[in-house]
Amino acid sequence: MSNFIKLSNISKSFTRQKNLKVLKKLTYDFKLGKIYSLMGPSGSGKSTLLNLLSLIDRPSSGIMKYGNKQIDYKNSNYNDVLRANKIGIIYQQDNLLPDFTALENVYLANLAIEKNKEISEIKSKKLLKKVGLSNRIYHYPSELSGGEKQRVSIARALINDPQVILA
């Protein structure tokens, strides 16, 4: 099984009143096709690591590779495309856009890649049906239960056929 994400000496610090080092020289290889679980007490760096893996944040030091390509944090356009194409993210909070329906929340994530609204809508409807929401696709987040919102988030994370899902 090949490495998909490789972390080498990743550290992350936050500066508030004092320098808080959350991750210290983390080295790990994530393989394709495997399932990983992050566990630890509150404040131990789980969310920080997920934000680094999803390219939402950058490490204070260290090297991260996706495939064989080292992440260049100055190239935000490339990183945005990588995130959209290869990474599905299911947030702890649903992060749905409140002014858009369940269907729109899912297909908007695909539209930047697909460039065809009709195809994006068809894919989105299929995914929403798979997660049991075919009768709720035109409902807004405020009209959905917490579990339904989470299922919309799952469909949104899956819409671009990612190689990795971070949750």
Positions of predicted regions on the chain:
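Conserved ABC ATPase signature
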Residues: 140-144, 148-149
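Short coil-to-helix segment of the ABC ATPase nucleotide-binding domain corresponding to the Q-loop/switch region
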Residues: 100-109
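Helix-to-loop junction immediately C-terminal to a conserved catalytic motif
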Residues: 54
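Conserved signature/switch motifs of ABC ATPase nucleotide-binding domains
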Residues: 84, 139, 160-161
